[in-house]
Design a protein with these regions (language model features):
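N-terminal Rossmann NAD(P)H-binding glycine-rich loop of SDR-like oxidoreductase domains
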Residues: 6-26
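SDR active-site strand-loop-helix element
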Residues: 9, 34, 70-76, 116-122
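Conserved glycine-rich Rossmann-like NAD(P)H-binding loop of the short-chain dehydrogenase/reductase
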Residues: 28-40
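Conserved catalytic-core motifs of eukaryotic protein kinase domains, centered on the activation segment
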Residues: 44, 80-87, 127-132
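Rossmann-fold cofactor-recognition segment
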Residues: 44-57
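NAD(P)H-binding glycine-rich loop region in Rossmannoid oxidoreductase-like domains
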Residues: 55-91
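Conserved cofactor-binding/catalytic machinery of classical short-chain dehydrogenase/reductase
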Residues: 69, 95-98
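Conserved Rossmann-fold NAD(P)-dependent oxidoreductase catalytic core, especially the SDR/UDP-sugar
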Residues: 97-133
Length: 133
């Protein structure tokens, strides 16, 4: 059985770490991780490669990979995004668009689909007012 090549962005977050560990335990995946932070010890051994830095500026790194799946978990959280809206737009919108373009490019080049999973939580809607925090 051939291993599927997987990219997990936001790999150092709570959900990202659990996903990386789950994929590793299941087997059959070669996992490439990406995050602003260095990998925690809990997942260092199961990541075939870690790309550290801002996703928008690291996107070219991923064009050399033939990903089967992309789990896009990287995001600027709502509380930070309210204060640093330009950074949030770069991370949440431009980063997502660049990954979608990567998936489309790879699909076209290799004539195979790249599964793109973009989960979210209720936090994307934000709170109605700052006082609710």
């Amino acid at each position: 059985m051939t291993e599927k090549l997987v990219l997990v962005t936001g790999a150092c977050g709570e959900i990202g770490q659990a996903l990386v560990q789950g994929l590793a335990q299941k087997g059959g995946y070669r996992i490439v991780t990406a995050d602003l932070s260095p990998l925690p010890n809990t997942i260092t051994s199961v990541s075939a490669e870690h790309v550290q830095g801002d996703l928008v500026y690291q996107i070219k790194t991923f064009y050399d990979h033939d990903f089967d799946l992309i789990f896009h978990l990287a995001a600027s959280l709502s509380s930070k995004a309210e204060v640093l809206s330009e950074d949030a737009h770069r991370i949440n919108v431009e980063g997502t668009m660049q990954l979608l373009m990567l998936a489309a490019y790879r699909s076209e080049k290799y004539q195979k689909s790249v599964k793109f999973l973009f989960p979210s939580s209720i936090a994307v809607y934000g709170l109605e007012s700052v006082e609710e925090k």
